[in-house]
């Protein structure tokens, strides 16, 4: 049971004392208490309960950095939050069990995860994924969730009567898919406090014999047996952000020979792009610091630092693929054969054959992952040509753009250097072949700029090959001819019907063109209450309109930038929320909260 895994140790008949200034002991509660030592992502939580009751009196967070001392054979001292706590156990055996737990926790300080991760980053990371609202955001990404479901269902042969490991299980949704596909048993490993919610879902769905929730990091837990297949959703921005892929690969120590991994491989695509508006947007932000009389203060000394800071931010949004100036370069990672150390420094050599003349403002990134099953191959894509996901696409600007001509070759390299903040420094070094022109930049993938607003993605300037005005009026004329209507300045004559002036090439976004995001049946983070009457839920293919109230009062923009960003469905119009269409374009006029 999960309680036994979450609750590492429970001891009765304990007494807690506070050590005063004169080293005198003061019984904190005046009676015996029970102590429960429970799993926590940062170590463990020591919880104090009234004896014979579930009433919790106190909770002390204990990490590998917590100072603690042995005192005799039945007592131990903890120093937590500046307070010295003297714990007297009922027996020598109980005290030894408690000390053994502390030793085991200290031994985990050198786990692979802890060695590569700052404490502050890990704390923020696990806190983020411990919120139901964040799990909901990912689950409501229709493309993400449904692709995983399709990949598992269509390869049920790989799951039938198999032992499955779900790495970073979160809510456990992938574990449920595996059981539905016939898995004999699923070990759902989750390091955040979401593990307790996953266990609640397992119990309420009567699957406690099929799905075993294990609270802990895959680098630190032990499994009772080897597994046949590993499932996970470890992708971040630009595929590698969050460094969860390393945890996914680490899980292979439990994988049987010839076992499978879902996903099986990941492709990171890189392409040069042109976008003068985006470049000037970032450039002009830094020009704030060009003021010489800002409330009597000269700010110019900080302008260069501000410019560097803005251009160190990767841009998270979506774009028209026609801004790409060359075919994308693909960097592939085979998860079945790759080692986690291979992801510590990723170098991608690039050679772009320019297809059109213009200014290259930087490099665009997106990724695809493949589920290579025995029966079918399924792909999940975040390409700008596909339905929008909560990963969007990422663009990295050059502070000094390069003017390129059709037929020229732009070469160089992109290096992703892993850091202890569970992210990467992105180093770009580009050179225009046959010239002395070069441009470099280093960006901080941990600090992206989430630019997507929900507005329609405009076509690149100069995309029209015919007159849009003539095409618009020509289609109106054709419509009028079909309806046998005589028009005078758009007004019907002789009562012969009307021409719809809004149906062709307007700047208004059709209601049906919304991101392909499944809303589920509950309210969503960041969503506004619809003022529009809704109809009962219908099948997915019916494109239902669902009104939901926000479930979180936190700043959604800040919440969503650790993993993927806000699901596109959570962008709202002032009067309505339309979701689950077959297109990847957002609602016109939507606002971001």
Swiss-Prot record:
Start-end of Low complexity biased regions: 523-535
Transmembrane segments: none
Keywords associated with the record: Chromatin regulator, Cytoplasm, Methylation, Methyltransferase, Nucleus, S-adenosyl-L-methionine, Transcription, Transcription regulation, Transferase
Residue intervals of the SAM-dependent MTase PRMT-type domain: 122-429
Class of this enzyme: transferase
GO BP term, example: peptidyl-arginine methylation, to asymmetrical-dimethyl arginine
The family this protein is said to belong to: Belongs to the class I-like SAM-binding methyltransferase superfamily. Protein arginine N-methyltransferase family.
PANTHER family: HISTONE-ARGININE METHYLTRANSFERASE CARMER-RELATED, PROTEIN ARGININE N-METHYLTRANSFERASE
Name this polypeptide is given: Histone-arginine methyltransferase CARMER
Lineage: Eukaryota, Metazoa, Ecdysozoa, Arthropoda, Hexapoda
Annotated gene: CARM1
């Amino acid at each position: 049971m999960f309680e036994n895994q979450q609750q590492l140790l429970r001891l009765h008949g304990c007494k807690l004392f506070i050590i005063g200034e004169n080293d005198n002991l003061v019984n904190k509660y005046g009676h015996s208490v029970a102590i429960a030592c429970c799993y926590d992502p940062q170590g463990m939580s020591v919880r104090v309960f009234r004896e014979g009751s579930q009433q919790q009196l106190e909770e002390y967070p204990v990490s590998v950095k917590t100072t603690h001392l042995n005192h005799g054979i039945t007592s131990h001292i903890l120093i937590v939050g500046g307070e010295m706590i003297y714990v007297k156990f009922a027996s020598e055996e109980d005290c030894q069990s408690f000390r053994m737990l502390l030793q085991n926790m200290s031994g985990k300080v050198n786990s692979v995860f802890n060695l590569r991760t700052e404490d502050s980053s890990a704390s923020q990371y696990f806190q983020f994924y411990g919120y139901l609202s964040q799990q909901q955001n990912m689950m409501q990404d229709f493309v993400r969730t449904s692709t995983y479901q399709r990949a598992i269902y269509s390869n049920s042969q790989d799951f039938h009567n198999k032992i499955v490991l779900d790495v970073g299980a979160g809510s456990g949704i992938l574990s449920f898919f595996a059981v539905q596909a016939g898995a004999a048993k699923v070990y759902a490993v989750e390091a955040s406090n979401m593990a307790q919610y996953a266990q609640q879902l397992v119990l309420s769905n009567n699957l406690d014999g099929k799905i075993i929730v294990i609270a802990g990091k895959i680098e630190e837990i032990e499994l009772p047996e080897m597994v046949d297949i590993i499932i996970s959703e470890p992708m971040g921005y630009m595929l590698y952000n969050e460094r969860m892929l390393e945890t996914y690969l680490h899980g292979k120590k439990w994988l049987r020979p010839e076992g499978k991994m879902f996903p099986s491989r990941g492709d990171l695509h890189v392409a040069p792009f042109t976008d003068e508006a985006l470049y000037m947007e970032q450039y002009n932000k830094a020009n704030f610091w060009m003021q010489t009389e800002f409330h009597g203060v000269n700010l110019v000394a900080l302008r260069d630092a501000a410019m560097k800071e803005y251009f160190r931010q990767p841009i998270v949004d979506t774009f028209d693929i026609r801004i790409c100036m060359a075919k994308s370069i693909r960097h592939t990672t085979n998860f079945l054969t790759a080692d986690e150390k291979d992801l510590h420094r990723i170098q991608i050599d690039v050679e772009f054959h320019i297809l059109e003349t213009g200014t290259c403002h930087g490099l665009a990134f997106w990724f695809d992952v493949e589920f290579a099953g025995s029966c079918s191959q399924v792909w999940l894509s975040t390409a700008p040509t596909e339905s929008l996901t909560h990963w969007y696409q990422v663009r990295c600007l050059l502070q000094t753009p390069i003017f390129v001509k059709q037929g020229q070759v732009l070469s160089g390299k992109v290096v992703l250097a892993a850091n202890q903040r569970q992210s990467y420094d992105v180093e770009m070094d580009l050179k225009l072949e046959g010239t002395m022109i070069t441009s470099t930049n280093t960006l901080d993938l941990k600090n992206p700029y989430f630019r997507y607003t929900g507005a329609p993605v405009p076509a690149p300037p100069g995309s029209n090959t015919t007159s849009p005005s003539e095409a618009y009026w020509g289609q109106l004329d054709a419509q009028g001819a079909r309806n046998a209507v005589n028009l005078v300045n758009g007004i019907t004559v002789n009562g012969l019907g009307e021409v719809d002036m809004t149906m062709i090439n307007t700047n208004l976004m059709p209601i049906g063109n919304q991101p392909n995001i499944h809303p589920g049946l509950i309210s969503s983070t960041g969503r506004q209450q619809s003022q529009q009457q809704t109809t009962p839920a219908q099948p997915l293919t019916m494109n239902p309109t669902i009104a939901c109230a926000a479930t979180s009062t936190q700043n959604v923009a800040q919440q969503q930038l650790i993993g993927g960003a806000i699901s596109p469905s959570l962008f709202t119009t002032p009067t309505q929320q339309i979701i689950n269409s077959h297109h990847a374009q957002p609602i016109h006029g939507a606002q971001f909260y």
